[in-house]
Structure formats: C-alpha cells, structure tokens
C-alpha cells in the first residue's frame, strides 16, 4: 500500500528540506528552528499526543509580531510545494494516476465485453462524443500567476530527477535549479497587491491554453486514437475533435459591474490576438518542416507556377503572412485605432483549415502519411479545438437586468410598465415584438446607464464574428419571459443567427420549476422554430446548496435534470445540460468520473458542458500531461454513462430521497435562516469579514453590499467555513436526515441504494471526503479564541452534529473509517494536515489579535494583516479547494 506513496513522500521531504535551507539563508537559524519545532509538534499532535497539541497552541499564541509572517509563509509555501509534488506524482511513472490515460482503454474493454453492445454502437457513441469545458475565473485561484509558473518549473525538475541514468553533474544542476526556484518563490510576495481586473483574469485563462492545453489537447487525441485503433480497429477522422474550451472570463457580468461591454469587446480581440500568436509559432515550424517537393495535381493547381518548387512551404508562407496581417490589425484595434479591415484578414476557422488540410491530403496521397500525421495533424486539431477565437466566451447576466431594461423602454414608449405586467402579458408582448418586422428601440432614446450597458452588451454580441460567442446564460432565471426577453434584446441589436440562450436555474424553487418553465417555452411555436431543435439549460449547483443544504440541493438538481431530459426527448429537442459545478463539495464539485455516472440516465446524450473553476483549472489542466489525464477521465465517463446508463431509481428510492430532502432542508434552514445566533456565530467563528480584504477576483463578494447569508455569494460562504475546518455548508442537514431515516427502520434500504445507485453512493462519498477534511478540535479552537461565550453552545451543537453525521454515514457505507475506498486521497489529506494545522491555529490567533486591535480603536498592524492573508491562502492550499 505505502510503496506507492514512498516516491511522493520522498519528493515532499526533499522539497521541504530545500525550503528549510532557503528560510535559513534568508532569515537565520532561529526562525528555521522555530518552524521545525512547530512542525514536529504538529506531527505529534496529529498522532494523538495531547501534551504536544497543547504546546503547539502555546507556541503559536506566543509568537512575536515579527515571527508571525515568516512562520505563516513557511507552512503556506510548504503546502504549495506539497501540492506540486502531488500533482507530479499523479502523472509520474511511479504514481497512482500514471494509469489515467488507460481509463479509455479500460472503458473500451469494458464496453466490448458487454454482450448487448456491438462495436458499431460503441463507434457511434465515440463519434458523437462532445465535451465543452467552460473556464471560469472564480475568485478562488488564490495562487498568483507568477508563483504558478515557478511551480510548473519545479514539476519539470522533479520529472527530470526521476531519470535513473542522470550523471552526477546533471543531478547537481537540477538540484541547483530547484534551489533557485524555491528561493525565488520565497522572496516573492504570495499575496496580490490589488484585485485582478477582468482582463487580467482573461489573460490568466489564455496562459492556461498556451502553457498546457495547446500541447495537451493534441496529445490527448493521439492517445484516444491509439486506444480506439487498438481496441476497435477504428481511426479518428482528422476533423474529429470532441473537446472545446469556452471561457467566462470577460463575459460573466452577473453581479460584477467591472465586466462591461467594452471589456467584453477587448477580451474578444485579445483572444483572437493570442490565437494568431500561437498559430504563428505552429506555422513557423511547418514552414521549416514541410520542405517536400512531391505533391498531388490538386495541390499543384492550388499553388500555381509560383509555388510549384516547394508547394507545401509556399502554402504555409502564405498562411503565415495572413496570420501576421491579422495580428497587426488586432494589435491596432487593441490600442484603440479604428482601421479598415485589411485584405487577407482571418475571421473564420475554414480559412486556417483549408490550406493546412490541402497539405495533409496531398502528403497522405503521395505516401508521406508519417509526415502528415506529425506536427501538421496536431495543428489541424488545434484549428478544430481553438480556431480563430482561441476560446469562445459565454455572456452571463442576471434576469432582473433584462426585465428592468424592458421596463424602462415600455415606460418611455408610453405603453405601460413591463416590470409590473403579469407573466402572460409579458409573454404576449415579447412574442408580438419578436414576430414584428419593425424595430422596437427608438433612435433618439437616452436610457439609464444600466440599461445602456445591457443594450451595448447585445451590440457586442451582434458585431462579434459568428462562433466567437458560445451562449448567453441568464442567471436567476425563473420564468419563460426571462428567456424570451433576451431573444428580443438580441434581435433588436441586429444579431443575424440563433444564439443559444441558456436559462440558469439555481435556487431550490427554481430547480423545482425548471421543467415547467421549459415546457411552457417549448409549447410556443415561434420559440420552437427559433431554436431549431436544440436547447441548452444550465443547472446551478452552488447557489442551490447555499439555499437549501447539500442533500436537498443535489436531489433537486437530479430531479430537474431527469424531468428536462424526458420533456425534451418527448418534444424531439436535443438538450445540452450545462453543469455549473464548483471545485468544492458545497458547490457541487466531485471527482469527474463519479459525478458524471451519478447523473440521471440520458443526461450526457447532448454531450457534457461543465464549468471548470478557479483553482480546479490548475489542478486538472495545469500541465499537458495532467490535461491528457483529465480529458481521458471525462471521455471514459461520458462513453460509459451513454452506453451503460445508471439504473432508473426505484420508486421507493425516490420516496426516501424526497424524505431526506425535506428533513435535511428543514435542519439546514433551521440553523442558517432561523437561528438568531447563527449569523453572529458565522461572522465571528470564521474569517468571513477578513476574506473581503483578499484581492482575489474581479468580482465583489456580495451581490448586495448589505444583508445576511443569503446575499453572500456562494464562494465566500463556502470559503469561510473551509478555513475554520467545520466545512458546514457541505454536510449540514444531510446526516441528521439519514439518521432519521435509519431510525425509521430503513437502514438496509439505504445500504442497497448505496450499493446499486451511483447517485446515492456519490452523495455519501462526497460527504466522506468533506468529513475527512473537517476537524473538530480545530473548529473548537476557533470558537475558544474568537467567539463570544454566549455563542459557544451553538458551536458545540454543530460539532456534535458533525460527529453524529460521520457515524451514520460510515454505518450506511459499511466502512470502518473515512475514505476507505480512496486511500490515495486519505493519504494526501493526512500528509498535508501536519502543515495545515499550524496555519489554522495561527489564523485563529491572528484573527484574535486583529479583532482586538480593531475593538480598541487602534490602527491594524500590517505584519498581522499580511500574515493573516498568508494563512488564508495557505489553508486554501492545504484543503486543495477554496470556495
């Protein structure tokens, strides 16, 4: 068992040693001794030594203000290094997930062994594979880009050090490079000084494409092709690329006033500029490689006399000059210059594809397939995956913004107030206007700034090259008129094609009404004509969990999807479900394979579209090899879910879920909404107020500046509870509901559900993962240090609940300890706890000092503030997810 982890452990301790040397060089022996003492006490405390636990608390409470920052930074940096070692371990030959690309082979073998699945059926399922990953800049990627680059290089060093045949001088050279990188990280400020702008976030997204996806996607397709050839004797067509990337960075304006129409326009141009930049590098390589002379008559006809001597090079040089022209024009536009479009400007993917594909066909026909299937094939696949836009963007806006804009317009036109009309009147007005030939917007109308912004955004969509914007997502969608309103605003902007408009259902009530809303829409003839048989619906995970607790939310999500799938199937509509999952459990995060197989049967027929958020992007796509691994996992899961769908839940299972849902929602809301002590307890037991000071994302932490838990965004809500290790949003209510159903004599039925129904077993698995990261003594320590005595009983009550919940989940899952079937994750949590515990204790101490200073009306000590930020970032690294 432990053989597998010894390589990981030795890398972690080597990196720790180098970090120790760096700290000693920078700050002297005494600080290193202090850090080492704390580490040893923490290790012993974890092993159950109470005296050492007490000493750990005393030591950290007695640190001077000068020692706070170095100690916090030491443990925080160590966790970043441990995460890097773990990321490397997951792709190293010695590691667990070195077998991830085999996932595809394993899945194909499993499918081939099914007596009722023909190879033709499997092949058809492969051909209809569709995977769209939507990168979002949630304010959760705590680590600065500059440190991420250094960690990627550390990864490269670890990879090279694994080479058995290294000469001594090579090993010494690599160790010297590691020391340099770790020293550079130590001497870099890990906390950003200001919040990133939406454009900075978009650039972060482009960096992921350049550093990882650009190489990772073609590598994944080679892997997929190899497995298909080996297992099914089937080759992927050249133009078959089942994966695409979309981004919310620069397009998501929901509750983020910093994302304006101008920003979106700028990001679209920047994205195209980055695409020309990356394709130019590819084409440069092809210019030097494709020196061949022999070509088909078709290719020779294409290049004419001028290019006959080196036909492939001739085409590549032409393409290169078009890319350079395009890049220069985009650069001028980005600088604000208004230039006419030059001749040869690239705006469509076909213009990139055609010359490349002509070369490919000619090389194949002339017996040079080995050359055609080299760099040229990779570039062709990049054209299909990224193309001229590089990544498409989604626009997301809150439904009330559209309602307010139309209200302002109808009042100006003197035809009443749209906002106060009934739903039936709204629909009648919208359908009438959608069918009308005359424009609705008056020429000389001067709307308010808010309405102007909504109209300008629609204008940007209408002007953007077709294919650069993927969808318009309406958050907090509640009614059919919410969807029709967006179609009308887009029509008024002069959009010439049917843009996918996706309602996002995200509260418990909205999820329960989702099917009704979509049924009404599909009953409108005009609407059916517009969508041409395709509909996208987005399911919100994070807000529903914050609204009703994780058990009720996940059942509502399941039922909404199930009903929508059946409604669309009956209506002959191809449904794409868009999953708005977060990285953490309380926001719907789950290991990809388990999460997909736990969805209702048929949910992946229209492909998978899912958000990849903040810090998860780095864990899943931070390196080309990890990209191959993540895409392979998704591919295997989609094929399996479509060809071996999970069972339809039995009626009795549905009834139990209904019961669990009602009880857990009541318990959850009983605390979060109805207990008068809850909000004051939350504010004092977690760093919620201090989190607002972290310059994390471009988006404010609250939708409205005042208000209680309901106005907090889902991310800071989860983030705060993750920091104090109570992890409350990810379990509150679930265990109590399970306990009640067990007391009603249904334990054996729950055990059957756990064994035979992926939806239910995944839910329990997610609870176990949260329980493994939660920590009762640390949560209690936060209470003792930070919470007023009269609120202590509430904290104790919540911790007792957590303890009971762990027992009931283990009983139903028939496990003696948490994470019994995922030892790799359990190992990883244990490894990091030794370094996370001191950060938690220190954070409670810093919050105590910082709040005391504030109560006494004194100026905050910058050393305390800075160290506090570092502990927040460090605990986030230790928990491997933020919000």
Curated annotation (Swiss-Prot):
One annotated GO biological process: carbon fixation
Pfam families named among the record's database cross-references: PEPcase
Reactions it catalyzes: oxaloacetate + phosphate = phosphoenolpyruvate + hydrogencarbonate
Entries under InterPro entries matching the protein: PEP_COase, PEP_COase_bac/pln-type, PEP_COase_Lys_AS, PEPCASE_His_AS, Pyrv/PenolPyrv_kinase-like_dom
Residues the record marks as active site: 138, 546
Keywords: Carbon dioxide fixation, Lyase, Magnesium
One Gene Ontology CC term in the entry: cytosol
Molecular function in Gene Ontology: magnesium ion binding; phosphoenolpyruvate carboxylase activity
PROSITE patterns, per database record: PEPCASE_1, PEPCASE_2
Assigned protein family: Belongs to the PEPCase type 1 family.
NCBIfam families referenced in this protein's UniProt entry, alphabetically: PRK00009.1
Record protein name field: Phosphoenolpyruvate carboxylase
UniProt lineage: Bacteria, Pseudomonadati, Pseudomonadota, Gammaproteobacteria, Enterobacterales
Gene (UniProt): ppc
